[in-house]
């Protein structure tokens, strides 16, 4: 069962570096509820894929941005973004859960 957790900044040890890349859909910068999943990734990528209800399944519509842009425009997501590889979250209700299949995927 997904649970609600809140990470304090001190506990968010897996926060991406500001120069790492994040994949986002339309609606992320606009403040929509976000579904996030963090995949094991190469060093230049944070592993985070952030989508909203505006995402239509077309990967060509996704954008790659630096983490510092997300931290600036969506500070409400910062605690979630400190979760380790394999985690998922839904910002709309604060649920977080671990997905072993995601954690085991190849970078």
Enumerate the predicted regions with their spans.
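Short helix/strand-capping turn motifs
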Residues: 5-57, 65-67
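A short local loop/turn or secondary-structure capping micro-motif enriched for an aromatic residue
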Residues: 58-59, 107
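Short, compact, well-ordered microdomains
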Residues: 66-106
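Short, conserved acidic/polar surface loops in the N-terminal third of protein domains
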Residues: 62
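Fe(II)/2-oxoglutarate
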Residues: 1-3
């Amino acid at each position: 069962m997904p649970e609600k957790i809140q990470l304090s900044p001190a506990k968010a040890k897996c926060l991406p570096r500001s120069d790492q890349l994040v994949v986002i859909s339309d609606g992320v910068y606009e403040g929509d509820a976000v579904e996030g999943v963090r995949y094991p990734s190469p060093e230049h990528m944070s592993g985070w894929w952030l989508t909203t209800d505006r995402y239509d399944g077309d990967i060509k519509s996704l954008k790659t941005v630096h983490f510092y842009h997300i931290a600036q425009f969506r500070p409400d997501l910062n605690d979630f973004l400190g979760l380790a590889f394999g985690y998922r979250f839904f910002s709309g209700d604060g649920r977080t859960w671990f997905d072993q299949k995601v954690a085991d995927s190849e970078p």
